[in-house]
């Protein structure tokens, strides 16, 4: 098996910078691919938290002028993960999150900020760092979408390219007048290049110009080829369907392991499920919920947005309250949803608890202490919280979309009888169907034998990176074989 060098290009990587599941994936993939003979090094922007968190940083290149200022390319690491960091203070040394200011507005120069990331990635791909010349450049989401464009519209030899869609809803569209500023030739602005409805489309560029496309579940790979979920790119995705693959994400079993988790009140495994009770008690105390042990406690860990279906949860709260179900919600996002959930928590203390924001420790406690985890997304490319829920014995209640449908086995009569059910699915994604799913979940919870079977089935599921890594490794080798057969050996 011939060793492969690959460069991952992403705007986030756990544990240095995280706003969502993208960071978890890019953080776990290098370690997952290592047993397959693949050295995956990740290029990320030099945000303040990244610069502060990296180890053994060594400058390997200086860009005298990169979209408005000088920049350094650092070789570094974080634990076992090898990194390149683009240290460009004029682009990345800012408050707020990677994409927006503290008041929630997108940075006005995001086009340049993420073009710089892609430009650096392309140059690394073409041999900028002699000690690490990748066979493959693997870009993630719109922020890295121009990587393939810089490689395509260059006279230098280019490595193979892979582009992964984590969420098609965020596409990175910018005015065509920036084409020259971004260093792209006029010939790139066409339907077979970066042009997208008269603008420069970063996501579109990645989809159009990369050798292979992946997305983060088989179901989502099919859904985005239809107008309902294709976000205007379904035609292109149908055209490139023979180069499109859906590969499920996994979770890091070292980080998400209830038997060793130091962030929870009591550790446990599939054979010691009663020990979960201490976590339920701790979770109730943290959220100010009443301590009746027989009440169903549903957890939610989510961005508060229309996509995530949290408005539907608000509409079904009267049912939840009448059923005596408790709710512990951790999330942030839409200001109106944040205010609405705060209000219902104030109106129903003891039954509804809400923490606005994100807290990794609290997320672990919710997974370990909630009886069920609700994910009512209108669309969900893969989803990671339901994978963690399976691992922790929190029965997932999910919309039948994308990766949720690929990873949760609905507790219908046949699945229960066969001993394979792991959760509850509902479809279509409406208030009434969510309400029906909550009633069904409450009924299953009242049958403790069935409920424990759902928990145990979920905890025995393989939600690790083993299978996904094998699929990515095969994709890499097949791609290299198509370009240079001797590299596939």
Swiss-Prot record:
Q: Which Pfam families match?
A: Glyco_transf_5 (PF08323), Glycos_transf_1 (PF00534)
Look up keyword Chaperone and say if it applies. Answer: no
The pathway where this protein functions is:
Glycan biosynthesis; glycogen biosynthesis
The EC class name is transferase
Q: Which gene encodes it?
A: glgA
Q: Where does ADP-alpha-D-glucose bind?
A: 18
Task: Extract one GO cellular component term from the record.
Answer: cytosol
Q: Does the keyword Nucleotidyltransferase apply?
A: no
GO biological process terms, semicolon-separated: glycogen biosynthetic process
> What organism does the record attribute this protein to?
Rhodopseudomonas palustris (strain BisA53)
Q: What is an example of a GO molecular function annotated in this UniProt entry?
A: alpha-1,4-glucan glucosyltransferase (ADP-glucose donor) activity
Per the entry, what this protein does is: Synthesizes alpha-1,4-glucan chains using ADP-glucose.
Family, according to the entry, reads as follows: Belongs to the glycosyltransferase 1 family. Bacterial/plant glycogen synthase subfamily.
Q: What is its EC number?
A: 2.4.1.21
- Tell me the NCBIfam families matching this sequence: glgA, PRK00654.1-2, PRK14099.1
Q: Spell out the reaction equation it catalyses.
A: [(1->4)-alpha-D-glucosyl](n) + ADP-alpha-D-glucose = [(1->4)-alpha-D-glucosyl](n+1) + ADP + H(+)
The family database entries (InterPro entries) matched by this protein are listed as: Glyco_trans_1 (IPR001296), GS/SS (IPR011835), Starch_synth_cat_dom (IPR013534)
Keywords annotated in UniProt: Glycogen biosynthesis, Glycosyltransferase, Transferase
Q: What is this protein's name?
A: Glycogen synthase
